[in-house]
């Protein structure tokens, strides 16, 4: 760069700096500009605030417009005085409120209610009140062009009132009405139809469904909160068949049902409220269950939000049916005859009878025997008779099992002599084979003792599922038990103790004592027939068996007195049968019979039974595999020793 270029750049820089300095505002101008900028910012903030206020005003005006439209649409129905209409028959008494045109109280006759919502105990026992007042809410929501119509906000005018029917009408304007008609049958079913008249112009042309919002605060009806709460569920029925329920726990549950359903039930342990839609409820119904605190008098808060068909033209009514009644299997099954929808509603599935195999036992045996006996005897006697009947049915197999154990007991000296040479751990396979061979000589099957237990276990599980759901036991007294459907406390206290709760159940204690006695008898019987190390192992296992009654105590202290009483008498009879068989069995005669059989088999050997032959073949295969493994291990050890040398 030459000298002229440098001078030129310097002059340009001087000009730029001078021009910038010349155009720089003075201090006064800067202050003025700052003030103006502050004013501009304030104006901008004010404009934003005004814009927000205007938007809020527009929303308020829009809301006011909707309210004004709604008032104009149902001016006469939005104001009024609520009246009570009572529908009743010999089974139920339903109180309807003209505000909302819904059932606000349901009383089930013939079942004693405890009214646990009254905490001071001043209320006397009377018929069961399923819900009352704000416990229950049902509203239908219709989306009109300019406003939503919510039935719970409207006052309806009753007409054609009888003991079993009523028509309720809300007037929307000239020639425009919304009518709900209720008809009570002779049982627990209430039919309801909702129909619009002259309102087609209020809705969009394609509008054909409405929202149904049903909620209920399930009352505690029984004494045991934890036990009743376990059987209190929100249950729904698939339109294609089959029921399901929310998996309620200790937290709030929200669930979307991705299938079409035709009814929803808010189910207590022994009573249910059900809503059925003739045209079904559409997919994506939203169900909620919220647990309630113990001592509040309530169990769970249920809510079901659904959609179903609605005809704005009024040519077709939206029809519903309600069931307010007991969870009695036969009553629920026969209720379908009261329905006018012609559906297989399967209400009886609300009574849980167990898994498929267990349900089959309860459905086709326990239910029929229970109903038959309960028509003649008190419920406590029915439980005893059912136990005796089951013991009578299983007695031949129990006796066969005991005789098999007795044969093994009298053969114990011979087994010890035959297996005396197999004392090493690696000789256990040979020892088992020697024992099986000795049993085969005398025609004894060591597996025959398992059959009775395999048969009795499904019966025990069946009763475990049946008794807690048997409403026939509710309120029934027997001996010291005031109610067979709940626990029978011998002691109670106010503080909740972990694992025990706030009481001690007498029938649970009796059940556990009987279980301890029966375990001691069976363990001694099994120990008497064991040989060598098996007997020592049995001594160690018996302590585990003795812990079972203690575990059962913590598990069943909250369970019903009826179930614990059944288990108590079942174990008592089992112990009595075992004691009788032991006293009537002569070991010397039994051994003589076995010796005679041995001589007969020795002179005319018989082929082993299929099961015994398979066991012997399996043991022989295991012996060969063990021998092969030992041979390979010996070869490997020999190679290691040779390498070491």
Feature map (PLM): residue ranges:
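Helix-loop-helix
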Residues: 1-54, 96, 193-197, 206, ...
């Amino acid at each position: 760069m030459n000298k002229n270029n440098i001078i030129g750049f310097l002059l340009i820089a001087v000009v730029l700096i001078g021009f910038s300095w010349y155009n720089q505002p003075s201090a006064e101008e800067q202050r003025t500009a700052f003030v103006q900028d502050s004013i501009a910012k304030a104006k901008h903030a004010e404009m934003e605030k005004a814009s927000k206020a205007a938007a809020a005003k527009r929303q308020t005006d829009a809301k006011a417009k909707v309210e004004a439209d709604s008032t104009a649409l149902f001016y006469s129905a939005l104001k009024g005085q609520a009246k009570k209409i009572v529908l009743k028959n010999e089974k139920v008494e339903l109180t309807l409120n003209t505000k909302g045109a819904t059932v606000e109280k349901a009383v089930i006759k013939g079942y004693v209610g405890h009214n646990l919502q009254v905490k001071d105990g001043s209320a006397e026992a009377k018929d069961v009140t399923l819900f009352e007042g704000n416990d229950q809410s049902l509203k239908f929501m219709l989306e009109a062009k300019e406003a939503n119509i919510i039935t719970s906000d409207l006052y309806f005018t009753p007409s054609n009132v009888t003991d079993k029917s009523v028509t309720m009408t809300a007037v929307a304007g000239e020639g425009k009405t919304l009518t709900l008609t209720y008809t009570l049958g002779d049982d627990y079913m209430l039919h309801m139809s909702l129909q619009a008249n002259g309102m087609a112009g209020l809705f969009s042309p394609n509008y054909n469904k409405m929202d149904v919002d049903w909620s209920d605060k399930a009352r505690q009806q029984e004494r045991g909160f934890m036990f009743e709460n376990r059987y209190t569920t929100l249950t729904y029925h698939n339109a294609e068949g089959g029921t399901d329920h929310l998996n309620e726990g200790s937290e709030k549950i929200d669930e979307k049902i991705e299938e079409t359903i035709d009814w929803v039930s808010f189910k207590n342990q022994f009573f249910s409220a059900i809503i059925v839609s003739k045209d079904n409820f559409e997919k994506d119904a939203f169900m909620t269950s919220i647990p309630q605190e113990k001592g509040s008098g309530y169990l769970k808060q249920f809510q079901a939000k659904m959609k179903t068909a609605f005809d704005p033209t009024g040519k077709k009514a939206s029809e519903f049916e309600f069931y307010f009644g007991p969870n009695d299997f036969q009553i629920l099954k026969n209720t379908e005859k009261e329905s006018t929808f012609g559906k297989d509603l399967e209400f009886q599935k609300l009574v849980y009878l167990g898994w498929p195999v267990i349900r089959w036992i309860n459905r086709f045996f326990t239910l029929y025997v229970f109903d038959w006996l309960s028509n003649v005897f008190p419920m406590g006697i029915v439980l005893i008779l059912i136990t005796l009947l089951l013991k009578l049915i299983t007695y031949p197999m129990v006796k066969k099992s005991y005789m098999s154990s007795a044969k093994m007991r009298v053969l114990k000296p011979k087994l010890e002599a035959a297996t005396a040479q197999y004392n090493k751990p690696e000789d256990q396979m040979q020892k088992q084979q020697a024992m099986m061979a000795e049993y085969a000589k005398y025609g004894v099957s060591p597996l025959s003792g398992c059959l009775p237990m395999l048969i009795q276990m499904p019966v025990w599980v069946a009763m475990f599922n049946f008794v807690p759901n048997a409403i026939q036991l509710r309120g029934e007294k027997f001996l010291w038990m005031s109610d067979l459907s709940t626990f029978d406390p011998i002691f109670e206290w106010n503080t909740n103790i972990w694992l025990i709760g706030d009481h001690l159940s007498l029938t649970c204690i009796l059940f556990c004592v009987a279980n301890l006695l029966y375990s001691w008898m069976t363990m001694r019987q099994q120990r008497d027939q064991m040989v060598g190390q098996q007997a020592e192992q049995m001594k160690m296992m018996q302590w585990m068996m003795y812990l079972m009654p203690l575990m059962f105590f913590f598990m069943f202290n909250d369970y019903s007195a009826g179930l614990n009483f059944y288990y108590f008498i079942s174990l008592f009879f089992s112990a009595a049968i075992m004691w009788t068989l032991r006293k009537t069995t002569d070991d010397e005669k039994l051994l003589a019979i076995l010796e005679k059989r041995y001589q007969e088999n020795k002179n005319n050997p018989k082929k082993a039974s299929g099961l015994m032959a398979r066991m012997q073949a399996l043991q022989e295969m295991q012996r060969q595999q063990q021998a092969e493994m030992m041979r390979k291990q010996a070869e490997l050890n020999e190679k290691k020793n040779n390498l070491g040398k």
